[in-house]
Curated annotation (Swiss-Prot):
Pfam families given in the database record: ATP-synt_ab, ATP-synt_ab_N, ATP-synt_VA_C
Native source species: Vesicomyosocius okutanii subsp. Calyptogena okutanii (strain HA)
Record's catalysed reaction(s): ATP + H2O + 4 H(+)(in) = ADP + phosphate + 5 H(+)(out)
Signal peptide: none
GO molecular-function terms, A-Z: ATP binding; ATP hydrolysis activity; proton-transporting ATP synthase activity, rotational mechanism
Record's protein name: ATP synthase subunit beta
Length: 459
């Protein structure tokens, strides 16, 4: 085991000098002898000096401290012993429940599966959320992004998806909290505990208060645990909240590592860093990883390099819109902006496809007519356009839905709507069967039968 010494400390980036015959390799884990802090080698600078990122706070460090080279990358526990536990970026337990006691450790840096190992999938994953199941259906073994600015409901949507999918799903799940609020991590833990699925979930947290090294690597820690379950032949769910913080952590350390910033101040390696993570999140012939990732959109700008880079890797994109949220429609999913590769008549069937396109068509027409209505009023529209507007407003309200995880805030019981009921409901509105119903009865309901029941009560 070779020993070096710290020569320079700049925030989370630390330079260590080793002897010429004991130089660490890139991504090797180093340990500071006095504090036990782990560092990860990023660059070899020459003059026998390596530059490393600290996987923890650098307070208490000083030049001249001894550092050992472990000779291997960061390794984390994998397997069933991680289920029901909360771990940090190094796989160390942070839930005061004793050691993990794992039989196997895996390194967090792994190559993506080979092409011949990949297994494409067309099987749909029902979420019970109407707007998602209809407009941007998820594939089992696919990658989904929840895009949204600050405060439009990414985490609440993520929680509802976890509740609906993880509870109905008999397999294992991994949740990686990347640079998000500690309170949300705590809420999530208790939500899982109350739902009795905690024994099927591994939790890995590197929250907002952590140094950038932790936030940069915690997604890889969670992904490594998911890959192990997949390679055992299981179908795994991987939830990442929030992928933007992964990019942001890379930006924080990039300048300290001496790289020139690129567009909007992001690191020049943004695309390759994102690719290295996303290409590993895939399904093979052994098992599948279905991944749902929250993506923060800075200043609601979808063309920002970080969300724009993420788009390229996803099978379905759920775009949460501030304009929809302002109307009081939750989940605030924009049905005209959200997309899915699965929305294909050969995969979802003709009826589902036609109803989804019909819903988008009527909402698009309403959007086009809004200016005319604002200037001239509804009376100037043709009868056909009046009918379209009326149906669009009903569709818009019917896209809202009370969530189980929001019951404590709204007081309304959550609703799970099957895909069959979702298609039947929107088809009834588009076919004119609901033309005589007032639009307010469609707001915050589950199935179309509930709308009919509400209307009778009001009558």
């Amino acid at each position: 085991m070779s020993i070096g010494k710290i020569t320079q400390i700049i925030g989370a980036v630390i330079d260590v000098e080793f002897s010429a015959d004991n130089m660490p390799k890139i991504y090797d884990a180093l340990k500071v002898l006095e504090t036990g802090l782990t560092l990860e080698v990023q660059q070899q600078l020459g003059d026998h000096i390596v530059r490393a990122i600290a996987m923890g706070g650098s307070e208490g460090l000083k030049r001249g401290l001894g550092v050992t080279n472990t000779g291997e990358p960061i390794k984390v526990p994998v397997g069933v012993k991680t289920l029901g536990r909360i771990m940090n970026v190094l796989g160390e337990p942070i839930d005061n429940a004793g050691e993990i006691g794992q039989e196997v450790d895996w390194t967090i840096h792994r190559s993506a599966p080979d092409y011949d190992e990949l297994a494409p999938t067309t099987e749909l994953l029902e979420t019970g959320i109407k707007v998602i199941d209809l407009i941007c259906p998820f594939a089992k073994g696919g990658k989904v992004g929840l895009f949204g600015g600050a405060g439009v409901g990414k985490t609440v949507n993520m929680m509802e998806l976890i509740r609906n999918i993880a509870i109905a799903h008999s397999g294992y799940s991994v949740f990686a909290g990347v640079g998000e609020r500690t309170r949300e991590g705590n809420d999530f833990y208790h939500e899982m505990k109350e739902s009795n699925v905690l024994n099927k979930v591994s939790l890995v947290y590197g929250q907002m208060n952590e140094p950038p090294g932790n936030r940069l690597r915690v997604a890889l820690t969670g992904l490594t645990m998911a890959e192990y379950f997949r390679d055992e032949g299981r179908d795994v769910l991987l939830f990442i909240d929030n992928i933007y913080r992964y990019t942001l952590a890379g930006t924080e350390v990039s300048a300290l590592l001496g790289r020139m910033p690129s567009a909007v101040g992001y690191q020049p390696t943004l695309a390759s860093e994102m690719g290295a993570l996303q290409e590993r999140i895939t399904s093979t012939k052994k098992g599948s990883i279905t991944s749902i990732q929250a993506v923060y959109v800075p200043a609601d700008d979808l063309t920002d390099p970080s969300p724009a880079t993420t788009f390229a890797h996803l099978d379905a994109t759920v775009v949460l819109s501030r304009q929809v949220a302002e109307l009081g429609i939750y989940p605030a999913v924009d049905p005209l902006d959200s997309t899915s590769r699965q929305l294909d008549p050969l995969i979802v069937g003709e009826e589902h496809y036609n109803v989804a396109r019909g819903v988008q068509g009527v909402l698009q027409r309403y959007k086009e007519l809004k200016d005319i209505i604002a200037i001239l009023g509804m009376d100037e529209l043709s009868e056909e356009d009046k009918r379209s507007v009326s149906r669009a407003r009903k569709v818009q309200r019917f896209l809202s839905q009370p969530f189980f995880v929001a019951e404590v805030f709204t007081g309304a019981p959550g609703k799970y709507v099957s895909l069959k009921d979702t298609i039947a409901g929107f088809k009834a509105i588009l076919d004119g069967e609901m033309d005589d119903f007032p639009e307010q009865v469609f707001y915050m309901t589950g199935s179309i039968d509930e709308v009919r029941g509400r209307s009778k009560e009001k009558a």
